[in-house]
Amino acid sequence: MARDITFLTVFLESCGAVNNDEAGKLLSAWTSTVRIEGPEPTDSNSLYIPLLPPGMLKIKLNFKMNDRLVTEEQELFTKLREIVGSSIRFWEEQLFYQVQDVSTIENHVILSLKCTILTDAQISTFISKPRELHTHAKGYPEIYYLSELSTTVNFFSKEGNYVEISHVIPHFNEYFSSLIVSQLEFEYPMVFSMISRLRLKWQQSSLAPISYALTSNSVLLPIMLNMIAQDKSSTTAYQILCRRRGPPIQNFQIFSIPAVTYNK
């Protein structure tokens, strides 16, 4: 069963480069939806993980300019695709995915991400087999797979289809960084939280020895995995509040491109 969850639309604004030029003002409206695959939702614990190989997590974007669809044939689409492609380093180095492909399908730019931390075999070891063996155990999470993050952005400019790419990039970075920090890290930490995914990467080899040392069986594996996911100290918001010195743990300059002006 697949279900979609849509976040509230966010509006951003930036002025022209010269003396807050009103004519060069750029507005944008962003709406994102995540697709969840799994059983019917219940009141029990839910553990959200990325769609695992051979499946892949899709980051999908499409663009509008003054309410008109930006199509693959337009030069603006090409430059926006380059901006999306510039985020590969973020997904690979900070969230530990492999970007398998950056494709264009039906006027959408799609990043295909392969999870490098979890596999189906590990989910079987950590969740499925303990649930089969320990039917009496309580507090086990239900597994749901996040298969897609889809975003539609509508840019508004007083100058028609004229847009300066250097003004677009801050909108991309501000929106996606705020979406991750305020929503995705809290709701889907095993998918979008750098610290949660890093902790899982470091600790997954220790989970079975700890469970067997404490109980002589695998009964604690699902509970410990869920504890990593539910630890709110893994969120960027918590790290910002508690970290008084030093550089930010996560770099949210996700997108970049040379500042060039296009008019098409």
UniProtKB/Swiss-Prot annotation:
It is found in: Nucleus. The keyword Hydrolase does not apply. The keyword Nucleus applies. Residues 200-221 are annotated as: Leucine-zipper. Keywords: Meiosis, Nucleus. Its main location: nucleus. GO terms for biological process: meiotic cell cycle. Interacts with REC104; seems to form a functional unit with REC104. REC102-REC104 interacts with SKI8-SPO11 and this interaction is required for proper subcellular location of the proteins during the initiation of recombination. Interacts with MEI4, REC114 and SPO11. This is Meiotic recombination protein REC102. It comes from Saccharomyces cerevisiae (strain YJM789) (Baker's yeast). The lineage of its organism: Eukaryota, Fungi, Dikarya, Ascomycota, Saccharomycotina.
